[in-house]
Structures are given as structure tokens and as C-alpha cells.
């Protein structure tokens, strides 16, 4: 989705207005949905959320166009050695914007769409070139919303839902890389 990374509250509010009055904001170094907010034009807390998220203009914050398909869930796709090996559909709880499982989202095994395969095919070589053997990417509708290399969760859920144990794939890639 259309994205802005800024520490300027004025820029972030202007970006929100340009995106139809609603955006998702999140810290660049966050994990598990911490610090993720749906900020709307009529929200009386919008400025306070942005002040907190930017530490009063000293820390970068990412703002993304709000994608309504989030209500249907986003996909966490695990790429091992640059190849997609498993995918989860993460569906947010009824009164929640975040689909993260530990905040009440629920998981289901998912197949990749043609667009998701295209995203993986374009991203895989870049990850391999940079020596990134494991990444979790989040896809919402047709949009890549996140590339997570610090906490790419989903292994346990994929296995519990019958999608196989991906740990062996990861170990094979690590051994083959000589890392």
C-alpha cells in the first residue's frame, strides 16, 4: 500500500488525509502488533497516537494506506531460502484491527494466490542475495505490507494446522549455505 515513513506529526496527519482519512501506523522496530494503530480523521486521539509513536518527533513511524480487506485477514508467508514454504491466513478478532495471533487473531492454513506467488518470486532473489535465509512476509489483498526478518512467526501454527514441519527445510537451507 501507499506508505510514508516519517517522524513529522504534521506529515503523518497530512498523509492520513491524503489517504482518505484513515491509515495504519506502526513502529519500524515493532513485533507482534505492538504499537500498531488504525488512525482516522475523526479520531480525537490521532495526534496523541502519533506523538507517542514518534516519541514526540524523535523516532520514525510508518504510516500505510488503510486496506479494508484487513477484515478478511492477512497472510503470513514464510520464505525459506527465498522460496515460499508455508502460509497462514491470520483473521483479526471482531473488534480488533490487528490480525496477530497473540492479540486474538485466528489462523487457518492458506494457499498462495497468483499475486502472492509473484511477490515471492520477486522478493526471493533479493533475500538470497542479502543472505537472508528466513523471512516472514505479510500480504494484505494485493499488497506486501511487511517483511519480517527478526521474528518471522508461523512455524508452529502451520505445523499444528497440518501444513508440515518447516524446520527441516530451514535446517537444510542453513546447512547448504555454510552459515
Go through the PLM ranges and name each one:
Residues 2, 35, 97-99, 145, ...:
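Glycine-rich, flexible loop/turn motifs
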Residues 9-10, 17-24, 28-119, 123:
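Phosphate-binding site of ATP-dependent enzymes
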Residues 4, 78-79, 138:
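Well-ordered beta-strand positions
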